């Protein structure tokens, strides 16, 4: 009887620990707002702050729309390998903007690409995944829309798993949104991310 109890104790302890490590960041589709369809390339810190205010004042936040995502064209170049935001469009910087969004009880999202460039031709994350992930974590990013432009024939599954591993390595919970267009059957491998 003691052996059975010991076995059950070890099994249940191991199972509980394994379940803890499989914690899902976003068990349902995230609800929120993305800047691309509204502003395209013409985004600014002022607009994003205004959208954050509106998400709260109009009741969207209370209805579950908690993610505010800044899409492509927030970035301009890399400095010592670190992605830099457009200081004209975002004079306070991305960290300050994320802090503002968080102060409204919302989650802050940002955009990048698995290719060498984003869809709009800005610097992508290819080859900089771990550096970008650390930068995003330092800024307080909660969500990453990860696009598939300028990928030079890369393996989609490997590219998305690389960014997933990079985000996990930061210790900050950042939801990874696979924006791969469906050409590489992400429904077969995306759940593992």
Q: What role is predicted for each listed range?
A:
Residues 112-116, 177-183:
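Acidic carboxylate-rich catalytic motifs and surrounding loops in phosphoryl-/glycosyl-chemistry enzymes
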Residues 123-124, 183-193:
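Substrate-binding cleft/loops of secretory-pathway carbohydrate-active enzymes
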Residues 19-49, 54, 174:
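N-terminal module-boundary/linker segments of secreted carbohydrate-active enzymes
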Residues 108, 174-176:
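Hydrophobic beta-strand scaffold residues
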Residues 1-20:
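Bacterial Sec-dependent N-terminal signal peptides
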Residues 51-153:
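Aromatic-lined carbohydrate-binding/catalytic grooves of carbohydrate-active enzymes
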Residues 23-27, 60-63, 101-103, 137-138, ...:
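Extracellular/periplasmic catalytic domains that process cell-envelope and extracellular macromolecules
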Residues 157-174:
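Short acidic, glycine/proline-enriched helix-loop-strand junctions
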């Amino acid at each position: 009887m003691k052996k059975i109890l010991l076995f059950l104790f070890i099994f249940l302890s191991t199972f509980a620990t394994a379940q803890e490590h499989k914690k899902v960041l976003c068990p349902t589709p995230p609800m929120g707002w993305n800047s691309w369809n509204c502003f395209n390339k013409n985004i600014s810190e002022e607009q994003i702050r205004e959208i954050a205010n509106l998400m709260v004042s109009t009741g969207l936040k209370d209805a579950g729309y908690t993610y505010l995502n800044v899409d492509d064209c927030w970035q301009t170049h890399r400095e010592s390998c670190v992605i830099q935001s457009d200081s004209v469009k975002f004079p306070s910087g991305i960290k300050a903007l994320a802090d503002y969004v968080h102060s409204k009880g919302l989650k802050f999202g940002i955009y990048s690409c698995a290719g060498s460039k984003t869809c709009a031709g800005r610097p992508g994350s290819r080859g900089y995944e771990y550096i970008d992930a650390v930068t995003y974590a330092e800024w307080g990013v909660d969500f990453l829309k990860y696009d598939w432009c300028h990928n030079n024939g890369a393996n989609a599954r490997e590219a998305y798993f690389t960014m997933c591993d990079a985000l996990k390595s930061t210790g900050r919970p950042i939801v990874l949104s696979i924006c791969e267009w469906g050409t590489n059957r992400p429904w077969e491998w995306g759940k593992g991310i």
